[in-house]
Amino acid sequence: MYYFVTASKDASIYLQQPSQNTGRDEILEISKTYYGNLKDISHSLIKFNTNSISQSIASGEITASAAELILRECESSEIPTDYTIYAYAVSQSWDMGIGTRFDEISTDGVTWSSCKTGQNWMSQENHSSDTTGSFNGKGGIWFTGSFSSQSFSYEIDK
């Protein structure tokens, strides 16, 4: 039996555009890119409403013991032949916002600097020891005890 759940909200946030919101963009970006000595990182945030799933598991309607997150690659360039993607639970609530990647840089909603318009991500010091984040409290704070990862390895055709 398959049970499909779509995201209730999503957005990408960018180190080099710390006040940009992409809550209405159709593309989620995950990257670590270097432009000479300049590093740019993008994180994607995805929220699922799990209340109905929890109720269906409790009632026995859903008996599956595993779940999958399916993301598709789109217009990628210069992907390394070996890499791993990690998924962590974000420790704060956040607002999706209404921006897209190429809108004005400042749009309401989640950004690298803030989880909601006018509300910065909490610093690491304000969280328990089972969370981590960037050194300056920007880019999100996430739980470290529970995560999922997927590694990819490609052989280049000769």
Sequence positions of predicted segments:
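Secreted, disulfide-rich extracellular signaling modules
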Residues: 1-158
